[in-house]
Amino acid sequence: MQKTSLTALARHELRHALSASNGRSARTVFGGHEHQLRQTLIALRAGESLSEHENPGEATIHVLVGRVLLRAGEATWNGSPGDLIIVPDRKLSLDSVEDSVILLTVVKNLGL
C-alpha cells in the first residue's frame, strides 16, 4: 500500500507552476502507460488553460485548490475546492480562473 498527501503535493506542484514559463506543472500520482487507471495532479497559474482536446476516456476532475472552468462545446462547469466534475465524453478545455490544482482521474479507452 502507498499513501500520498495530495495537500503537500498540490502545494509543491503549484509552486512549480507559478515559476514555470508555461504556468503549469503536473505529476502522475497513480498509474502510467502500463495501467488503465491514471491519476494526475495538475497545477495551473491563474489565467492559464489546457487547450481543447479529446477526452482520453472516462474521467473526473477533483478541484483541490482555486477555481477552474471546464468547457465542452457550449456547456461550461465551474469548479471550486472540493468539487468533483464528471468530464463529458467530447472535446473539452479547462481554464484556471485562480491559481489552481486539480486531480484528473482517467480510465483510458481500450477501443473494444
State each model region's role.
Residues 73-90:
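Short acidic-glycine-tyrosine-enriched beta hairpin
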Residues 23-26, 38-55, 89:
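Conserved short histidine dyad/triad with adjacent acidic residue
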Residues 1-36, 71:
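A short, N-terminal "cap"/entry segment at the start of jelly-roll beta-barrel domains
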Residues 34-37, 45-49, 67, 109-110:
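Short, charged/polar surface micro-motifs in flexible loops or helix N-caps
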Residues 64-65, 80-81, 98:
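A cytosolic small-molecule/anion-sensing beta-strand core signal
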